Structure formats: structure tokens, C-alpha cells
């Protein structure tokens, strides 16, 4: 345990520069599924709304379906594509045996993705190691995203993946606005003050609640069929 109260691992760093508040916003929430089709259909039934089509990520060997929540935030359901071999370790810890076991038991939150203006500066100053910045594209969409070489997630997904859309467009621009709303994202951690300090460094994020306890990530959603709390214990 270091002075910040966080157990050291390869994803966390000491702050290397004076505190600098960055501009950021939640970009999207990531739900992992073992089978994309059947588990998206189950969510559509639970929520009472259809998901939009997503696409494939050939480099990662994954595919997804999307749902616009509000403003510029969307929900992504992602799964390994059984017809595609990845060209590298899959992102969002999807090749990790623990993640595979969790997804075998049903759909679970994997992580959340934070949109930043300057991804290289944010990566340098965020106070943890979100991974290397890689370029991705699908159709006319292009983006930069942080992915560790081992495909892992910082603090198991509690700390955000960073993303930048160079063209200023993210999928929410063309998705159908749904009645499903993110009320808040709940983070539970043994040292909540340490997580809060890092997130404050990344910018004001009013949709995030941080509580003390065993590591967990929970998406709280309001839908036409009621409120849902989608939770992963990490």
C-alpha cells in the first residue's frame, strides 16, 4: 500500500506533474457479453427499447451493439466475434480468464470510457497508466483510445479508458436517442479518496458516485420498464 492508499500495480503511477484539471466527459459505458445477439435481445426486452446496430472491430476480434442514452453518452454491448481472430490481445480485458468466467455467468459492466480533448496530455497527467494510445477506425469513424498491451483495465475498470474523437464525432451523433437514461455511475473502492483525486484530476464528472467497499462498478439506468443497476464485482 502506498501513501495514496491504493495497492500498487502496473496500472497506477505517482503523480509526475502539478495538479492540472482537464476537460472531459463520459463518452460511453461498456457492457461485456459472451454472446452479442442473445444478450442484446435480453436487454432490449428488459429495457423495453431496441438497440441500434454497431459494427465489427477486426483488429480486436470483437463486435458490438449500441444504445444512445442522453446527449453524447451511449451504452455499448461488446462481445468476442466468433467469426474473427484478433490481431492483438483484445481490449477491455476480454481475453482475461476472470473476465471470461464473469461473462459466462451473464452480461456485466467491463469499464467506462472518458472522452478527452488531448489524449496524449491526459494520458501523461492522469496519475495512472491507462495504456498506450492506439488509432482505431470503422467506416468513416476514427478515434484514438488507450489500451494496455495486455488488454487489461486500470483498477479492473474502475479507472476510465481514455478516448479522443479527432473529427469531433462519436457514435452518439448518429444513434437514435432512446428513453433510457444514465442516472449515475457508481464506483466502489477500498480507498475512495484516491479514486476521487484521480477523477478530479480528469475533470468534473457529476454523474459519478464513489463509495467505500470492495471494488465494484455499477451502471444505474432509468428505462421505460423501470430502474436497473448493472453491477460487476471486481
Residue spans for each PLM region:
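Glyoxalase I/VOC metalloenzyme domain signal
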Residues: 21-26, 32-50, 62, 69-234
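A short beta-turn/loop motif at secondary-structure boundaries
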Residues: 57-60
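N-terminal amphipathic/basic-hydrophobic helices that include classical n-h-c signal peptides
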Residues: 1-20
Amino acid at each position: 500500500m502506498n501513501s495514496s492508499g491504493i495497492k500498487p500495480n502496473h496500472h497506477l503511477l505517482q503523480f509526475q506533474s502539478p495538479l492540472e484539471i482537464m476537460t472531459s466527459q463520459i463518452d460511453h459505458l461498456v457492457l461485456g457479453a459472451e454472446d452479442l445477439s442473445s444478450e442484446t435481445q435480453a436487454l432490449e426486452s428488459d429495457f423495453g427499447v431496441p438497440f441500434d446496430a454497431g459494427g465489427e472491430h477486426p483488429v480486436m476480434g470483437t463486435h458490438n451493439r449500441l444504445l444512445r442514452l442522453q446527449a453524447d453518452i451511449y451504452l455499448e454491448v461488446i462481445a468476442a466475434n466468433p467469426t474473427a481472430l484478433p490481431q492483438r490481445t483484445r481490449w477491455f480485458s476480454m481475453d482475461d480468464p476472470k473476465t471470461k468466467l464473469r461473462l459466462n455467468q451473464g452480461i456485466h459492466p467491463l469499464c467506462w470510457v472518458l472522452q478527452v480533448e488531448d489524449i496524449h496530455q491526459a494520458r501523461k497527467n492522469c496519475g495512472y497508466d491507462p495504456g498506450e494510445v492506439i488509432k482505431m477506425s470503422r467506416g468513416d469513424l476514427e478515434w484514438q483510445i488507450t489500451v494496455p498491451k495486455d488488454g487489461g483495465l486500470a483498477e479492473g475498470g474502475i479507472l476510465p479508458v481514455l478516448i479522443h474523437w479527432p473529427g469531433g464525432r462519436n457514435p452518439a451523433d448518429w444513434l437514435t436517442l432512446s428513453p433510457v437514461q444514465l442516472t449515475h455511475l457508481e464506483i466502489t473502492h477500498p480507498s475512495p479518496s484516491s479514486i476521487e483525486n484521480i477523477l478530479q484530476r480528469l475533470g468534473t464528472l457529476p454523474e459519478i458516485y464513489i463509495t467505500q467497499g470492495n471494488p465494484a462498478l455499477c451502471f444505474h439506468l432509468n428505462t421505460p420498464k423501470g430502474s436497473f443497476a448493472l453491477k460487476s464485482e471486481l
